[in-house]
Amino acid sequence: MSKIRVHEYAKKNNISSKDLMTKLKEMNIEVSNHMTMLEDEVVNKLDNEYNTGAEKPSVADEFEVEEKVVRSKKNSNKKKKKGKGNEDKRQDNFAGRQQTQIVETPDKITFSGSLTVGELAKKLSKEPSEIIKKLFMLGIMATINQDLDKDTIELIATDYGIEVEEEIVVSETEFETFMDEQDDEENLKERPAVVTIMGHVDHGKTTLLDSIRNSKVTAGEAGGITQHIGAYQVEVNDKKITFLDTPGHAAFTTMRARGAQVTDITILVVAADDGVMPQTVEAISHAKAAGVPIIVAVNKMDKPAANPDRVMQELTEYELVPEAWGGDTIFVPISAIQGEGIDNLLEMILLVSEVEEYKANPNRYATGTVIEAQLDKGKGTIATLLVQNGTLRVGDPIVVGTSFGRVRAMVSDIGRRVKVAGPSTPVEITGLNEVPQAGDRFMAFADEKKARQIGESRAQEALVAQRGEKSKLSLEDLFQQIQESDVKEINLIVKADVQGSVEAMAASLRKIDVEGVKVKIIHTGVGAITESDIILASASNAIVIGFNVRPDVNAKRTAELENVDVRLHRIIYKVIEEIELAMQGMLDPEFEEKVIGQAEVRQTFKVTKVGTIAGCYVIDGKITRDSGVRIIRDGIVIFEGQLDTLKRFKDDVKEVAQNYECGITIERYNDLKEGDIIEAYVMEEVKR
């Protein structure tokens, strides 16, 4: 008899891999994971266990008995309630008469937010004049309708020997805070896994998505017509898998930045002939930051230069070790263009789903996340929603982000009109008053009026929040957040000009340990700071450290928009010193660098006794005569110094604005080339 893997035996005997692994542990047989090989002796023992087991009562019988018990309980409760009603009323009336005679001081009072003097007096069973007198003795002049803060309320109540408890009231407008609360275990049912495909450019992400869709979705459909709604479902072995049709990092970054966790499993596509590339590393960082299981699909196995062993070797550096080498990462060789290995990949997704046990409660109002949204001339606002919990029905009042409405129509991923959508189901809906953003959370309600009120309140709150935007984690307020126990771990993204600098800086930063707060480096890379780095920092509340590199124009704009702290340095020990001082609360810089503009070198002229004159075009901001400058070539800083001359035509000028040409010479530097970026900056005093 040949050896067999755990998951193969489980499949053969119609049991889950997880149950089988539990059974093996009960039999004192150790297995590391579902890919472990089982010896013949173990297989025989398992056969005996499963063949001789006592018959269990059917699920239908259990359900019937349980239903009878529940019904009998409900009936008994009704009887009790009928008998109690009049008795309770009599007791209440008697208590009311007693209260007019004797007023007892309570042992404990509760409040939320604040109380007026009159409200506090009522809760303490005292006269308002008595409370006003006590406040006067404490040096507080107050009237009966004046609001009192938490400290004053506690001070007065303590004086009477009464305990005070503040109630934290969660507004319905902030439904995100309680929509992810766990349901009771008995209400949870198995749901399909939600999968995102990530990887480097041209490694076959889109081809893989198309290959899965064409082989599974269109089979058996009338005319084979599918509708692109940003997500689709496939059926494998009578089980469904939901794929987000957004290859790349969008499904992770923009959604995670808004607090939405959509993906259950990540498929990391790596070309067998190309190996690990920069965006592959970026994808790994995103998946790990989100805490999502990774399955590696080694693509392009049909190519002559394919070398899967090299891919495995390179990925071990990022803690993705194949099961064949003693790790726990699943590697599946595929050829997306020829459709080879697709079935095996889908089976592995089902296997991970089975082990992870993804569940949801279908018997409640729907909650979930927006995948895509747009404005259509004929239909109005269209939004693709992923139902994550509950069941969404046509006609349900719904709040999506700051918009609201009623679900007028729902269309599935295959273009069919549907009336209901359960957990992990993507649907396209119409009926919202505004276009929401990808990553916005949604919740269905029982009452349309209530949904409208909550939607309008959320829109108003978002407007107020936008005016007083709260910044992300920054070095200036780091110590305060540590003191308030808000920060136990500091997330950093490190970018440098060469790999050696990245490794040296990462190693030095990891050694910092102040006040029990650890440094966690969530991503490292070589080259300029990109928009993708800023979005990852925003989603993970991280600080970006740049060593000898600069952010590009898009990254700079996104950093300002997302309030991400970007720190740029040219000396390693200063980076370490700055982080350490910030963690100790000693960081107190007097000046802050402010980049005021960038100019691109379009042409160079060499003039005797003058040096190199750069004919430039100002592409962003402005260049001023008294600003410091740095020369950036291919995203790397190669020189830093001062302007020597700044001219428009033949005239010396104080500044040149955006979209104008100028002539620039730089002190003690003549090696200017076409395509170089001259970045101008000034040092501004920072108020503390």
Curated annotation (Swiss-Prot):
Residues 71-83 have a biased composition (Basic residues). Pfam families: EF-G_D2, GTP_EFTU, IF-2, IF2_N. Residues 335-337 are annotated as: G5. Keywords: Cytoplasm, GTP-binding, Initiation factor, Nucleotide-binding, Protein biosynthesis. It comes from the Bacteria. Residues 299-302 are annotated as: G4. GTP binds at residues 199-206, 245-249, 299-302. It is found in: Cytoplasm. Residues 199-206 are annotated as: G1. Residues 224-228 are annotated as: G2. The keyword GTP-binding applies. The keyword Protein biosynthesis applies. Residues 190-359 form the tr-type G domain. SUPFAM superfamilies: Initiation factor IF2/eIF5b, domain 3 (SSF52156), P-loop containing nucleoside triphosphate hydrolases (SSF52540), Translation proteins (SSF50447). One of its GO terms (cellular component) is cytosol. Residues 62-103 are annotated as: Disordered. GO terms for molecular function: GTP binding; GTPase activity; translation initiation factor activity. Residues 245-248 are annotated as: G3. NCBIfam families: IF-2 (TIGR00487), small_GTP (TIGR00231). Belongs to the TRAFAC class translation factor GTPase superfamily. Classic translation factor GTPase family. IF-2 subfamily. One of the essential components for the initiation of protein synthesis. Protects formylmethionyl-tRNA from spontaneous hydrolysis and promotes its binding to the 30S ribosomal subunits. Also involved in the hydrolysis of GTP during the formation of the 70S ribosomal complex. This is Translation initiation factor IF-2. It comes from Bacillus cereus (strain G9842).
